[in-house]
Structure formats: C-alpha cells, structure tokens
Amino acid sequence: MSFNSFGRVLRFTTWGESHGPALGAVVDGCPPRLSLSEADIQPFLDKRRPGQSRHTTQRQEPDQVRILSGVFEGKTTGTPISLMIENVDQRSKDYGEIAQAWRPGHADYAYDAKYGIRDYRGGGRSSARETAARVAAGAVARLVIPEVQIHAWVAEIGGDAIDPANFDLEEIDRNPFFCPDPAAAQRWEALMDSARKAGSSLGAVIECAASGVPAGWGAPVYAKLDSDLAAAMMGINAVKGVEIGAGFGVARLRGEENADPMRPASDGSNRPDFLSNNAGGIAGGISTGQPVVVRVAFKPTSSILTPVPTVNKAGEATDIVTRGRHDPCVGIRGAPVVEAMMALTLADHKLLHRAQCG
C-alpha cells in the first residue's frame, strides 16, 4: 500500500494497523537542534486517547510514545524521527463477523476491491486508530512553529451546534466533548446517550483556528496553503468535508459581503488590519496574517449495533451488526487529530517559505 506520507519539506509517514503489535510515524525533514522528548508528545496523545469517557470507545490504550531515532541528548539531529506507540488492548475476536461481509459506509469493500485482501481486525489502516500516529507527528511539527497557537473544538454533534455567543476557549478541556459552549456540552450528554442506547452513532463538525501565522506562507496555484490543508484534513479517516473560512457560505454572499475589508494597521506597520475573515486567513493560496480557520465534517461511525443490509464476499444478501468497542461519535476525538494536521501542514509551509524566500 502506497501513499502513506504527507508533506514536502517536513514529511511524515504513518505505519501500522489497529490490531497489529504497534503503530507509529516517521517524521523526516525536521530541523536539527530542537529540544524534543517523549514528554513533549505525550500530552497531545493523552487528549486523543480512547476510553476516557462513556462517549468514546472503551478500548483501553495508554498510547505511550517511544522515540526510536532522530533525537540525541534531547535534541533533534536532522535525521528521520521514528515514533512508536504499542497496541495493548486489541480484541480481534470481535471482528469475526466482518471477515466475510462488508460494513456499509466503511472502507471494507473498497479495500477488498482495490487490493484483493484486507485486515478486517478493526479496519486495519482505515481505522481511526491510525490517527494516533498523526497526533504524535503533529506534536513534533509544533516545535517547528512555536509562534503559532492552534486550537480545535467540536462545534456540532448530530446536527446540534454550539452557540457562538457562549464560546469560551477555556471550556474545551473541561468536558469530554472538546466543546467551548457549556450549554451545548450538557445537551450532547443526553444526545450521545440516546444514540449509544439505540446502537447507533452520530457525526460531528470540528472547527480549528491557528493564530500567529504570519503573512506569506503558502504558494500560488499548485501548492496553495488552503489546498494542502484540505488534503490534510480529508486524509483523516471518517472525514467527508472541509471548509476554509466561511467555506460554502461564500456562495450565498455578495461580493462586498464576502470581501474582507482592510484598514491601515493600528500598530503603525505596513500590514493592514482586516475587518472580517471570510477567507479563513488565506488569499491566493497564501496566508494573510489572520487566523487560519478550517471546519471539518466527520461522518457517523460505520461500526454500529443497528443491523444494516449488506452483501458478503460470496455476493449474498445479509444484515451486519458490528460488535466490539467503537466510538459512537468518532468526531469527538477528532479535535486533537485536526490540530495535528494543521500543525503538520503549517510547519511544512513555513519551511517551504524559508527555502524560497529566506
């Protein structure tokens, strides 16, 4: 299987399967002499780690990361950084039923159609478990962009959205939903309980903003910052849609409404102040100095207890019920993953910009 790598200068590759002995990432192109230890990576993995509430999979994985290469005496050496996370709580017997039948909405059939073989234990590479490696790699990328602050939050679950008037960034780490609206988080408790008891699942929308990004990162046409961000987010398992800034909403605006008006800078510099940010901090594929903003749509988890009509490998009609431990809303734990992909993309573009423009 190819296409497991992302990035141009800062390039990372993820490896491993959901029910294999381990998974991980190799980060290549990281500048030398940056301070790095497992302690710099672990807090981000802990945010994504499963089994921390009844609203996520009950698979108990400590997700302890090990740095195998690329670091000497606490500093990056400029050589590939290999990161490994062991799997310790696999229950492959739960997946016997899907060895011969495909889960609608999952990658089972597509993998069989392409490769003629698939690891049905937890979905293999198509499992959300793969994203642990992205989060580890993203923690390394953050060291390359210390001037940038990245925050992601769940903005909507099952069609129930937060109220922007109640937005409080400090609330994100105070509830199991990465939710900045306490009232919405309370509603989601009941919403998630209802879906789980029904043997079903829910989708979610994640919003992510990166502040401190200077003007100038990105490139025209085929290396646009927004196109790379879209590819980064769409590469996350279970993601079905990405918006930059106002996204699809711009199609409903007039030109004067969509434009982000500029005024002379309040700090006296030659950089303008913007009065709005419909562009999401990117114009012509290049950052403007405003916050870079993306919205990411996660589909409902395909592995559910509700019987779903399908076909088995013999071509026979059947119903499938996916037993085992699964996220009733995979988007909840998607927030740290979206942050990681934002960091990896921005770090890559910072190094690209430095290579071309100094």
From Swiss-Prot:
Cofactor note: Reduced FMN (FMNH(2)).
Residue ranges, annotated region (Disordered): 39-61
Keyword Lipid biosynthesis: no
UniProt binding sites for FMN: R125, S126, S127, N237, A238, G284, K299, P300, T301, S302, S303, R325
Catalytically driven reaction(s): 5-O-(1-carboxyvinyl)-3-phosphoshikimate = chorismate + phosphate
Uppermost EC category: lyase
Example of a GO biological process term: chorismate biosynthetic process
Annotated EC: 4.2.3.5
Metabolic or biological pathway: Metabolic intermediate biosynthesis; chorismate biosynthesis; chorismate from D-erythrose 4-phosphate and phosphoenolpyruvate: step 7/7
GO cellular component, one term: cytosol
Binding residues for NADP(+): R48, R54
Required co-factors: FMNH2
UniProt entry keywords in alphabetical sequence: Amino-acid biosynthesis, Aromatic amino acid biosynthesis, FAD, Flavoprotein, FMN, Lyase, NADP
HAMAP family tied to this protein: Chorismate_synth
Family (UniProt): Belongs to the chorismate synthase family.
Description of how the protein assembles with itself and partners: Homotetramer.
Function: This reaction introduces a second double bond into the aromatic ring system.
UniProt-recorded name of the protein: Chorismate synthase
Organism for this UniProt entry: Sphingopyxis alaskensis (strain DSM 13593 / LMG 18877 / RB2256) (Sphingomonas alaskensis)
